[in-house]
């Protein structure tokens, strides 16, 4: 148990942003009175820590900037709460993979300089379980990279955690890339490539393993960046995904937000953005070369993760399963008995899913 409770954090994750990014994200946005103290403290810590960012930038340019990637990444896609974290943890047992860590999500500019000191303090302060679902939390565990990207540039969907009134705007522009400018897209390409190189350097891997739900809406751009990337798309019962996402977003946003959003508005955003993400993926998966995409139901993966992992490796021609199998088996064995949240779907939840997400129920063959 960490020193601080997640929902009582006096600052939010923008403390790890560079100063230029912090200013760009918050410029022209009104901070609600209840959060101005958190905003000011976050701003002050960010301003202080960002003075250290040039130290990493110097090392990055010297060691990594001109070094090409050995392999295109493997991307685990799927809407939030579709089981992507479990799959990410399973695949990351393979040491040829490199990944973004929990520490890196908050302090992406303090990776190549100062990491031991700041990581030790973060480990001491943070909880050891994810408050929404009891999944383990630790500074060196694999983590999705969107929070790290949000601290490296202002062009990410996760700005909505801080400014939720603009969630739909951020979704259209930075989740789906519908309204993004060429200049913003170039920044995304450069910063994401930089994050990948630092992640591989940090974890010692040779191929980047990404678990990042927002990438589900960016398939066309990702294929352009990485023509031979492999994609695993996870599907899960939409009733479970809705209930779990609503719970996850409602709880996670509390210590991060700098303005209020009503539960009703957040719920409507979950419903509409799920549909946007679903249709964007369905439209753009055609750009993935044949043999580089595998679509998997999470329920099938969860039922026999070992066999399914081997099947995915072989289907996508990912090397190294035999060498990684003992570590993967050990991790999966350690998850037996893990208590997941149990959801009961009331009549209203069932109605909302059936009215808004019938397309997914029908295509994937799910029912209550």
Regions found by a protein language model. Give the residues of each.
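PAPS-dependent sulfotransferases, especially Golgi type II membrane carbohydrate sulfotransferases
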Residues: 1-56, 64, 173-178, 183-189, ...
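N-terminal signal-anchor transmembrane helix
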Residues: 55-74, 105-109, 114-115
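Glycine-rich phosphate-binding P-loop
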Residues: 76-93
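Short His-Asn-centered micro-motif
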Residues: 77-79, 209-213, 298
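Post-Walker A helix-loop "phosphate-sensing" segment adjacent to the P-loop in P-loop NTPases
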Residues: 93-103
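PAPS-dependent sulfation machinery
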Residues: 106-208
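Ligand-binding pocket scaffold of soluble enzyme catalytic domains
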Residues: 196, 209-211, 219, 305, ...
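Conserved phosphate-donor/acceptor-positioning beta-strand/loop module used by diverse small-molecule
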Residues: 211, 222-247
């Amino acid at each position: 148990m960490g020193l601080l409770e997640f929902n009582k954090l006096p600052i939010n994750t923008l403390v790890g942003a560079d100063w230029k990014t912090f200013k760009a994200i918050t410029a022209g946005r009104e901070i609600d009175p209840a959060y101005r103290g958190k905003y000011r403290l976050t701003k002050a810590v960010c301003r202080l820590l960002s003075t250290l960012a040039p130290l990493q930038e110097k090392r990055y340019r010297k060691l990594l900037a001109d070094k090409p990637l050995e392999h295109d990444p493997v991307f685990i896609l799927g809407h939030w709460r579709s089981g992507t974290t479990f799959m990410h943890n399973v695949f990351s047992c393979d040491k040829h993979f490199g990944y973004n860590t929990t520490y890196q999500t908050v302090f992406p500019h303090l990776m190549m300089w100062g990491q031991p000191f700041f990581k030790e303090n973060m480990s001491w302060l943070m909880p050891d379980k994810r408050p929404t679902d009891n999944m383990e939390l630790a500074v060196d565990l694999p983590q999705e990279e969107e929070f790290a990207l949000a601290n490296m540039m202002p062009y990410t969907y996760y700005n909505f955690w801080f400014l939720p009134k603009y969630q739909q705007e951020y979704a259209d522009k930075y989740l789906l890339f519908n309204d993004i400018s060429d200049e913003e897209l170039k920044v995304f390409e450069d910063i994401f490539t930089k994050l990948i190189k630092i992640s591989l350097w940090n974890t010692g891997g040779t191929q980047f393993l990404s678990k990042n739900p927002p990438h589900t809406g960016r398939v066309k751009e990702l294929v352009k960046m990485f023509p031979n990337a492999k994609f695993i798309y996870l599907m899960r019962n939409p009733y479970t995904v809705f209930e779990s996402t609503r719970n996850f977003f409602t709880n996670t946003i509390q210590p991060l937000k700098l303005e209020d959003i009503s539960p009703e508005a957040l719920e409507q955003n979950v419903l509409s953005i799920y549909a946007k993400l679903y249709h964007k993926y369905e439209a753009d998966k055609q750009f993935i070369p044949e043999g580089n995409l595998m679509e998997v139901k999470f329920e099938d993966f969860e039922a026999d993760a070992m066999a399914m992992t081997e099947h995915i490796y072989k289907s996508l021609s990912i090397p190294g399963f035999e060498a990684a199998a003992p570590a993967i088996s050990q991790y999966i064995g350690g998850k037996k008995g893990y208590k997941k949240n149990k959801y009961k779907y009331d009549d209203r939840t069932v109605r909302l899913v059936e009215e808004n997400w019938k397309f997914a129920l029908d295509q994937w063959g799910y029912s209550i």
